[in-house]
């Protein structure tokens, strides 16, 4: 019984640790990371534990499978001030 309980607890902890997300990672001002080439986005996204590319139509880095703690851009919470 104790072993089953421990297994459930560790499984829930592991699920929380391994959860990943996708999106536009933001800089310290809340703006999307500007790009033109895929290489720079690949390096940025690898630093966040995922992979990515430059979404050329929007000139912004898109990352897949990045950690949940990475702040990502959202229209609802947009704090970016255009320069």
Curated annotation (Swiss-Prot):
Keywords: Disulfide bond, Ion channel impairing toxin, Neurotoxin, Secreted, Signal, Toxin, Voltage-gated sodium channel impairing toxin. Disulfide bonds join 31-80, 35-54, 41-61, 45-63. The keyword Secreted applies. Residues 1-19 form the signal peptide. Residues 83 form a propeptide. It is found in: Secreted. Its main location: secreted. Expressed by the venom gland. CDD domains: neurotoxins_LC_scorpion. InterPro entries: LCN-type_CS_alpha_beta_dom, Scorpion_toxin-like_sf, Scorpion_toxinL, Scorpion_toxinL/defensin. Belongs to the long (4 C-C) scorpion toxin superfamily. Sodium channel inhibitor family. Beta subfamily. Has the structural arrangement of an alpha-helix connected to antiparallel beta-sheets by disulfide bonds (CS-alpha/beta). This is Toxin BmKBT.
